[in-house]
Every structure is written in C-alpha cells, then in structure tokens.
Amino acid sequence: LPSTRQNAEGCGTQTAGLASSGATGPAGPAFLNTSCEYNGTGWSGTTTKNTPGVIAEAVFGTQTAAVAAGGYNNSGSTVNTVEEYNGSSWTAVNTLPTAQRSGMGCGAENSGLVAGGEAATVLTNTQEYDGTNWTAGGAIPAATYNAGAGGTSQSNSWFAGGGDGFKNATLIYDGSSWTASGNINTARDQHGGAGISTAALIFGGRTPPGPAVSSATENFDGSSWTTSPATLGTAAKQSAAFGTKTAAVYAGNDPAANITQ
C-alpha cells in the first residue's frame, strides 16, 4: 500500500482492485478519505473522496464502478454517506436509509447491498442498492457485523462469521432473502472475504477467545467449508479484502500496516 492502513475496505479483483479509506493508526490514528488502486503487482496513487475520512465503511463493486457506504468518523459518529467511484474520481450519491459501520458490502454498483453492521445497536437489516436508490431487502437472521463477505451481484452475495461475539454461520442471499448454509470451521470476526456464494474464501481475522489474530484460510464450495493449506504470510485483521476464491488480496492490518498479501 502507498501508506499504512487499518480498518480499510476493498473491492474488485486481484488484478484490478481498490482499497478505500481506513486509518493510519495505531495511536491517535488519522482517518483517511482516500482510495488507491491495485493492478496485481503494485499500488497506484491516491484519490481523494468528497466526505471526511472514515473507518469501517461497506465497499462493493469493481475498481471502475465502486460504492463506499457509511462508516465511522473521527468525531465518533456512525454516518450514512455514500460515494461512487468511476475509476478516476468519487461522487457523492444518495445516502443510506440507515447509518452503519462495519456492515458487509456485497455485489455490484448497480446490484449491491449492505448487510448488518453497527449503529446504536448491531443491525439485522439489508440495504439494497440499484445504482441510484436504496431500498430495504430481507433481514439477516441474526444481528451481525465485521464478517467476511463477497458477491458480484445481490443474488450471489454471502457473508460468514462475524460479531456480535464470534460467529460461525454462513448466510447466502438470493436477491430477496438470506438462507443459512454450512458453518465455517473456525468462528472468527474482523476477517476478509472474497468470491461469490458458490465459490468463496475467508482469511485472517480474530478467533476465540480473542484477541489472537489468525492467518488461516477456509474455502467454500456453496455448501461446506474446508480449511485450506494456504495461509496468509502475516496474520491480519480489519484489512481491505477483494478478489475471487482462487485469486484474493488482503491489504493492510490492525495495527496499521502497508503490507499486501
């Protein structure tokens, strides 16, 4: 990464990815309002957003059509601001109906969603986005935040694990409702996710009883999870994750770092 980041979020592919916002950490962190692009071998520049810096926003889409929604600002407020990225600049668009931080962003710019997250309480709602407007989707069965997630559209979105507490559940969205699938093998939160609901990957995060940070990876085939022999080179959490089941990226760490793996 061009600079150290923690609590950043990402989207895109291993050869065309995006990391957005986050903080410089670890003590008295500066909250960032910039993004940077990844081409598979290196990062390029930074692009400034219109709204003040946040951590723990929900990000989904691609490097040239991304959405960044909500987050937590350095004034201690959970926000409902939303911006879209076109590959060169950010534009403020319609706000979230419900402000959130640490929710799961899934899908594409014109077929995306934010599931769960935190505000005054941990949330169960799904907020769907069609590229212009936000509408209410199907509620998630249990209030959740900080889960690994993925999907390239609303209808192949998923998330696994997360808080409140260390969860092991996997939920898959069909465009209107969430359905439980096979549990992950090791409950975790603050981890990364990549891929779609039939071919997914989770990696890193915290595992019980905490605050141990993991380097472990699990693979999903649409019904069950298996522990992968491949592990992160550096145990990491709360970083920008993007890619597919077979080609994923995890950038940053907490405390803040500039590593990419």
Regions found by a protein language model. Name each.
Residues 1-261:
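Polar, enzyme-active/binding microenvironments
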